């Protein structure tokens, strides 16, 4: 492959260590659906994926696309590989985002857009599972469980859609150019379609979690009482057996759902509003 200089604006750090490439391949969700790679890079992971999967690959760098089309010309001609030159963040997500049928994703995500992409994969009902590599600290947030200090709004959103599992770390020395941080690979398997949360509830949940985790060192009750009526909170906390001094990271995902449902129900009765009360919402 022709010599290529990485571009900082695309957050390009290419994984080229064969040991970790093989570990990723061995960890891919075993689901017989279309496999999609986000960010092809120099094609090292792509080459390994093509040994076991037909592949749709999205790449935002036109210079790389030209090089990759030459490198994988045989696989492209045979229909085993389809390289799409697109910025996926600019693709509409009202219906299908990356594919019109069920799919799974394998990707070494650029650090600066990793969270955004993962959240869109969670929302896309055609995406059934994904294995991604991100900065270690980001991976810890997505994979954290109740009681862990890393447990946050992102953790709750993941548990609302499926189950996350941390797999392994990848040292910065495995990349070229070498990043300043350690990376981690994790996988998320999403629940079946009938167990997916409704879009309208998801929108409210995201707003609600911003309030719940607004000040992590304060109690959940204190954070929520900046927006919601204290008597209603006392009632729902008692229903959920949540102590008044509990912090948000100590509360289970199901309880967040139940609290929100309770407040939404009262809102429907005209007694409470989710996004605005006589008190100002934290900014």
From Swiss-Prot:
Main location: cytoplasm
InterPro entries: KsgA/Erm (IPR001737), rRNA_Ade_diMease-like_C (IPR023165), rRNA_Ade_Mease_Trfase_CS (IPR020596), rRNA_Ade_methylase_Trfase_N (IPR020598), rRNA_adenine_dimethylase (IPR011530), SAM-dependent_MTases_sf (IPR029063)
Residue positions binding S-adenosyl-L-methionine: 13, 15, 39, 59, 87, 108
EC number: 2.1.1.182
Gene Ontology terms for molecular function: 16S rRNA (adenine(1518)-N(6)/adenine(1519)-N(6))-dimethyltransferase activity; RNA binding
GO terms under cellular component: cytosol
Alphabetical keyword list: Cytoplasm, Methyltransferase, RNA-binding, rRNA processing, S-adenosyl-L-methionine, Transferase
Keyword hit for NAD: no
Catalytic activity: adenosine(1518)/adenosine(1519) in 16S rRNA + 4 S-adenosyl-L-methionine = N(6)-dimethyladenosine(1518)/N(6)-dimethyladenosine(1519) in 16S rRNA + 4 S-adenosyl-L-homocysteine + 4 H(+)
Membrane-spanning segments: none
Localization, UniProt: Cytoplasm
Family note: Belongs to the class I-like SAM-binding methyltransferase superfamily. rRNA adenine N(6)-methyltransferase family. RsmA subfamily.
Function: Specifically dimethylates two adjacent adenosines (A1518 and A1519) in the loop of a conserved hairpin near the 3'-end of 16S rRNA in the 30S particle. May play a critical role in biogenesis of 30S subunits.
UniProt-listed PANTHER family: DIMETHYLADENOSINE TRANSFERASE (PTHR11727), DIMETHYLADENOSINE TRANSFERASE-RELATED (PTHR11727:SF7)
Name this protein carries in UniProt: Ribosomal RNA small subunit methyltransferase A
Species in which this protein is naturally found: Helicobacter hepaticus (strain ATCC 51449 / 3B1)
Organism lineage string: Bacteria, Pseudomonadati, Campylobacterota, Epsilonproteobacteria, Campylobacterales
């Amino acid at each position: 492959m022709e010599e290529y200089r990485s571009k900082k604006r695309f957050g390009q750090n290419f994984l080229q260590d064969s040991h970790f490439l093989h570990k990723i391949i061995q960890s891919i969700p075993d689901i017989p659906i279309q496999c999609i790679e986000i960010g092809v890079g120099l094609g090292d992971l792509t080459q390994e994926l093509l040994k076991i999967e037909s592949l749709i690959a999205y790449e935002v760098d036109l210079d790389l696309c030209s090089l990759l089309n030459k490198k994988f010309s045989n696989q492209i001609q045979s229909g085993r590989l389809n390289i799409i030159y697109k910025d996926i963040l600019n693709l509409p997500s009202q219906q299908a985002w990356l594919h019109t049928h069920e799919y799974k994703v394998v990707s070494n995500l650029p650090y600066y857009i990793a969270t955004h992409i993962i959240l869109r994969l969670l929302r896309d009902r055609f995406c059934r599972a994904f294995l991604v590599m991100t900065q270690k600290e980001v991976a810890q947030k997505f994979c954290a469980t109740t009681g862990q200090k890393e447990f946050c709004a992102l953790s709750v959103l993941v548990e609302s859609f499926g189950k996350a599992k941390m797999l392994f770390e990848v040292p910065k020395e495995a990349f070229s150019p070498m990043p300043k941080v350690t990376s981690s690979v994790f996988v998320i398997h999403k629940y079946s379609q009938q167990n997916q949360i409704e879009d309208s509830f998801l929108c409210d949940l995201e707003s609600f979690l911003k309030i719940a985790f607004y000040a992590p060192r304060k109690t959940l009750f204190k954070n929520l009482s900046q927006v919601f009526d204290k008597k209603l909170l006392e009632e729902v906390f008692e229903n959920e057996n949540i102590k008044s001094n509990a912090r948000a990271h100590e509360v289970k995902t199901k309880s967040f759902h139940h609290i929100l449902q309770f407040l939404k129900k009262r809102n429907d009765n005209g007694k409470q509003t989710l996004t605005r009360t006589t008190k100002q919402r934290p900014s």
